C-alpha cells in the first residue's frame, strides 16, 4: 500500500537539466516504451502577474499564440499538427502558461520550430485580436453561467483580499472588454523570453541529438529583462 502513496522514482530519475546561454532551462527524459515525443514549454507568467484593471492578459495571450506568427500564419499551427498526426493544446494558471505538442518520434521537430517562432514572432493583427476577444469573452461568460464557476470565482475573491490570486484566470469581464492589442503586445514582450521559460521534452529520442536541435531552434533568441518579482503580501484574516 505504501508504494501507492509515494511518488514514483521513475518520474524524476534520469531527468537531465540543461541551461542554454540565453537562460532557457531544458529538461529532457528518454522514455523508449513507445515511439512518441511530448514537447511542453512553460512560461513563468500567469494571472498572478496581472495588476487590477489588466486581468486576463495571460489567458488572452495563450489564445493569441495560436493565431499566427511571422512564419506560421493563422491556422497553420493546428493544420501542421493534424497533418503530422499530432495533438496540441495549452493552458493558463495562476502561476504559469504552458503549451504542449505530442508527435510520433520521427516527426516531432516541428514542435521546436513552432515554439521557437512564437516565443518571439507572434503577430497581433488588430482584426484577429478583436475576433479572438469575442471568443474569450464568450468563454468567460460560459464559465459564469455554471454555478460551480461562479462559486469558484467568488471563493477566490473572498479568500484573497490583496494577492492577485483573487482575480479569475480568464480575467474580469470589464478588463477583457476594454483591453487593447497594444497592451497585449507589451505583455507578450515583457514575459515571453527564453530566460523566463522551461522547455520539457520526454519520449523516444537520443538526448544529445535533442539538445543540439533545441540549441539550433532557441539558442539565437536573446534573453529578456528579468521579470519583476511579485511582492504582493496577503494580510492575516
Pin down the residues of each PLM region.
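Non-catalytic, conformational "gating/processing" segments within enzyme and secreted inhibitor domains
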Residues: 185-217
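M16/insulysin-pitrilysin zinc metalloprotease superfamily fold
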Residues: 68-71, 102-133
Amino acid at each position: 500500500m505504501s508504494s501507492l502513496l509515494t511518488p514514483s522514482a521513475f518520474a524524476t530519475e534520469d531527468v537531465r537539466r540543461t541551461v542554454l546561454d540565453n537562460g532557457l532551462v531544458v529538461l529532457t527524459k528518454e522514455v523508449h516504451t513507445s515511439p512518441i515525443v511530448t514537447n511542453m514549454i512553460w512560461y513563468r507568467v500567469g494571472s498572478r502577474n496581472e495588476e487590477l484593471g489588466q486581468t486576463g492578459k495571460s489567458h488572452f495571450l495563450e489564445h493569441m499564440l495560436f493565431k499566427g506568427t511571422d512564419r506560421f500564419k493563422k491556422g497553420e499551427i493546428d493544420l501542421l499538427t493534424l497533418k503530422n498526426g499530432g495533438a496540441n493544446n495549452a493552458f493558463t494558471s495562476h502561476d504559469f502558461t504552458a503549451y504542449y505538442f505530442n508527435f510520433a518520434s520521427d516527426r516531432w521537430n516541428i514542435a521546436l520550430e513552432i515554439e521557437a517562432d512564437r516565443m518571439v514572432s507572434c503577430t497581433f493583427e488588430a482584426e484577429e485580436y478583436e475576433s479572438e476577444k469575442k471568443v474569450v469573452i464568450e468563454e468567460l461568460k460560459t464559465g459564469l453561467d455554471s454555478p460551480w464557476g461562479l462559486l469558484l470565482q467568488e471563493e477566490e475573491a473572498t479568500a484573497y483580499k490583496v494577492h492577485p490570486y483573487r482575480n479569475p484566470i480568464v480575467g474580469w469581464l470589464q478588463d477583457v472588454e476594454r483591453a487593447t492589442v497594444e497592451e497585449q503586445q507589451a505583455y507578450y514582450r515583457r514575459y515571453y523570453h527564453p530566460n523566463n521559460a522551461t522547455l520539457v521534452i520526454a519520449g523516444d529520442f537520443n538526448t544529445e541529438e535533442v539538445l543540439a536541435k533545441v540549441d539550433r531552434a532557441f539558442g539565437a533568441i536573446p534573453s529578456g529583462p528579468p521579470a519583476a518579482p511579485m511582492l504582493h503580501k496577503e494580510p492575516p484574516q
